[in-house]
């Protein structure tokens, strides 16, 4: 049974002694390797649960809205239902109640690997259950079988100018895949709304399977003179096929990609990309159009470009101070940055009030695999220096690093240095969360999104302010 945000929030904020209960709950999984069949069993139960919940508590208030919230990007307004993840200010993201360290512990791994397979994370997000290794292997095979691109999309990708931004190429290709939408076809033929989720599921599975092929083709065309990506290997997992198609054979890099694609997959429903997919999907647009819209949001500098900005800033710092810079020199550079009116990129978060656990797990990966890398050592020095400085300033609610403070450094180390491409990796990962949510949107019959807007004059009148 899926956890609603309301119940997930209560669990996530409860006493830590309850965590074994959460783990026991989500591990109560079906043995079936047929994901659609597992969902078919869960969905009617969740529909009934939500129906009864709304019947009993539908008129209950869950929050208030202030004028500042309306002018401030709706930050803090409780206005969405998201089943897949909850962001706790102190503990970070929880995927269906599980923290990142818990996911690293319980989700299946590749043979000889230490990082969770993204297939397992997707199974968890869409079902609420921790999958078995057999279920994850079956999902890997299914995505491999669904991965082939239609010829018109291949032709489109191969004829795009290499100067076109990789995110623009991704958006175009995903939109063109709409030609194959099973949901759009079923809708045009009058399928009953109770069946919408089944076709959204089929499209979502197809899209997730094809995204690494699209993304790898974009990379090879743009940065590797159009060298072919090769064929999908049905014996390899989703991440391993992706890294192979990108042209990388290093098993450590494949492990990094498994970690990267897992931890970037979902972050509640209110961020730009997730909310956009939900919003466009609420108009009953198919998953291809909805996801393409979300990717256009992810391409925005305030959402998907943060790790690039961190790298640019780090390279500037390294150029000015050199390698092995002392903590005092780093401190001076930080103060110089802040006094010039700039921020320290990669630090702070809209919701989090502690170090982002997505940063922590990447730091642990670096300590294990690249402890002597100069750029990583610089990041480590900054981690020691920045939080006390930001705390001293007293103007920052969260002086701790977020996920973007680290991810670019790891990609650079393994040779993926093309920063304009990083958002495409983010997009491939984010598909896991937003498309799992989209399936549940249709399963629960959520309506078209249509909040009420007000003018400034209307707001002033409503609160009794003089115009």
Curated annotation (Swiss-Prot):
The active site is at residues 303, 349, 404. PROSITE patterns: CITRATE_SYNTHASE (PS00480). It is found in: Mitochondrion matrix. One of its GO terms (molecular function) is citrate (Si)-synthase activity. SUPFAM superfamilies: Citrate synthase (SSF48256). Citrate synthase is found in nearly all cells capable of oxidative metabolism. This is Probable citrate synthase 2, mitochondrial.
């Amino acid at each position: 049974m899926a956890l609603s945000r309301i119940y997930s929030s209560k669990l996530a904020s409860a006493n830590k002694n309850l965590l074994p209960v959460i783990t026991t709950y989500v591990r109560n999984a079906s043995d079936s390797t047929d994901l659609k069949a597992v969902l078919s069993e869960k969905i009617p139960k969740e529909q009934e649960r939500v129906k009864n919940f709304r019947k009993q508590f539908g008129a209950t208030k869950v929050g208030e809205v202030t004028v500042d919230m309306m002018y401030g990007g709706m930050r803090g307004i409780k206005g969405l239902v998201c089943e897949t993840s909850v962001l706790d200010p102190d503990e970070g993201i929880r995927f269906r109640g599980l923290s990142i360290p818990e996911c690293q512990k319980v989700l299946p791994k590749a043979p000889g690997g230490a990082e969770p397979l993204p297939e397992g994370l997707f199974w968890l997000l869409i079902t609420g259950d921790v999958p078995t290794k057999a279920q994850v292997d079956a999902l890997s095979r299914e995505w491999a079988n669904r991965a082939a691109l239609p010829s018109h999309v291949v032709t489109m990708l191969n004829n795009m100018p290499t100067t076109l931004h990789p995110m623009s190429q991704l958006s175009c290709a995903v939109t063109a895949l709409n030609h194959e939408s099973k949901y759009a076809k079923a809708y045009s033929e009058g399928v009953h709304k109770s069946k919408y989720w089944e076709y959204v599921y089929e499209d979502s599975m197809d899209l997730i399977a094809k995204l690494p092929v699209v993304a790898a083709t974009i990379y090879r065309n743009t940065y590797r003179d159009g060298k072919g990506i090769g064929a999908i290997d049905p014996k390899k997992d989703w991440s391993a096929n992706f890294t192979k198609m990108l042209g990388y054979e290093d098993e450590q890099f494949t492990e990094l990609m498994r970690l990267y694609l897992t931890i970037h997959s979902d972050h509640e429903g209110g961020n730009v990309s997730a909310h956009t997919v939900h919003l466009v999907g609420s108009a009953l647009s198919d998953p291809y159009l909805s996801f393409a819209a979300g990717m256009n949001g992810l391409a925005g500098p305030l959402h998907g470009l943060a790790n690039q900005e961190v790298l640019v800033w780090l390279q500037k710092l390294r150029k000015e101070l050199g390698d092995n810079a002392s903590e005092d020199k780093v401190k001076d550079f930080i103060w110089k940055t802040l006094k010039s009116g700039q921020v320290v990129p990669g630090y702070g978060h809209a919701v989090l009030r502690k170090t982002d656990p997505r940063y922590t797990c990447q730091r642990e990966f670096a300590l294990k695999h690249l402890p002597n890398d100069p750029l990583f050592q610089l990041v480590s020095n900054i981690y020691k220096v920045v939080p006390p400085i930001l705390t001293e300033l007293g103007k920052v609610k969260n002086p701790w690093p977020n996920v973007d403070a680290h991810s670019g450094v790891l990609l650079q180390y393994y040779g993926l240095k093309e920063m304009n491409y990083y958002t495409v990796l983010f997009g491939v990962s984010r598909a896991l969360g937003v498309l799992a949510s989209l399936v549940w949107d249709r399963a629960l019959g959520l309506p078209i999104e249509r909040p009420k807007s007000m003018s400034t004059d209307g707001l002033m009148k409503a609160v009794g302010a003089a115009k």
